[in-house]
Structure formats: C-alpha cells, structure tokens
Amino acid sequence: MKNKRVIFLNGPMGAGKTTVGRLIQRSLAGCAFIDGDWCMDLEPFVGNSETRAMAADNILHMLAGYNNCSHCRGVVVAWLMDRPEICRALEEGAAKIGLETAWFTLLCTEEALGARWRGDKLCPWRTEENLKVSVRSLEAFSRLPGVPVDTSGMTAEQVRDHILKHLSD
C-alpha cells in the first residue's frame, strides 16, 4: 500500500502559502490542510525556539491523526518554517509515522511581495514593519530545503497547478 504524502509549503509571510495550500487541498480528494499558524496561536504572539518547537510538535500530532484516518489520503501543511532544525524535525517526524514528504518553498520578488501584502486587507498583521521582516527573509528562504517556486507574476491557481504538475512527474 502506498504511503500517504504530506506536502509542505514553506516561504516568507505573504508568499501565498495558505491560499495555495487551500487550493491544493480542494484539488486532491481526501486531502487535509494544516496551517502551522493555528499550531502556535498565542496572544500576544511569541515566536521563539520554544513556541516553534511546540508548533512543530502540534503539526506532527495532527499529521499522525490524519495518517490514521481512513478518509484522509494526504495532507498539505502551510507554515513559515525559517529554521533548518524545524524543517528537519518535521521531515523526520513525518517519516517516523510513515508519511512521504514533498517540500516546496514559495518565493517571489520584493515587488510582488509588497503588492500582495498591500492587497491583503483582511490580515491584521500585514503591517509595513512585518513587510520589512518578510522582505529581509526572502534570501534565507531561497537556501532552505524544498523545490523553489518563484510565484512572482503567477496567480495562486497557477502556483497550485505548477506544484501539482511537479508532484505528478
């Protein structure tokens, strides 16, 4: 029997991980979706090694549950995984529970990121200060594991199609 697959979507804030992840989920029968932000939703927000490790553990717990569910065929995880040790922990944890993995890092130009950022009126943390943080992180994300996907000039649907084509090759 073929193992279930988890598709990890990584990238800076505003790259389109959640939007693309939801589109992938809707395109694959029996696909679950995990937004890593749900797994460390603290108020006020605290992003440090302790909370990142907790979120990774929460993601792995959810992956194990979906892996044991007969109705689930695969999972998409969208999260900002900016530390190699977090990527490693998720990769190793997924392997331990018998999941195949596919990693994609969504990247874009600074201009595309800014345009998307300013167009998202619903997200309360789309501030100019956070945009600067996201722009500064672009280069670091290009060095992390995963198939790089330059989403500049692409719609979310085109990014989804690109990823699904890559998975079918």
Per-region residue spans from a language model:
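Glycine-rich phosphate-binding loop used to anchor ATP phosphates in small-molecule kinases
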Residues: 54-98
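Conserved phosphate-donor/acceptor-positioning beta-strand/loop module used by diverse small-molecule
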Residues: 97-117, 149
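Hydrophobic anchor at the beta1->P-loop junction of P-loop NTPases
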Residues: 9
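Conserved substrate/cofactor phosphate-moiety recognition/catalytic segment
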Residues: 21-64
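Small-molecule kinase domains that catalyze NTP-dependent phosphoryl transfer to phosphate-bearing small molecules
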Residues: 119-162
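Walker A (P-loop) phosphate-binding loop of P-loop NTPases
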Residues: 14
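Conserved lysine of the Walker
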Residues: 17
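Pre-Walker A (Motif I) flank of P-loop NTPase domains
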Residues: 2-6, 72-73
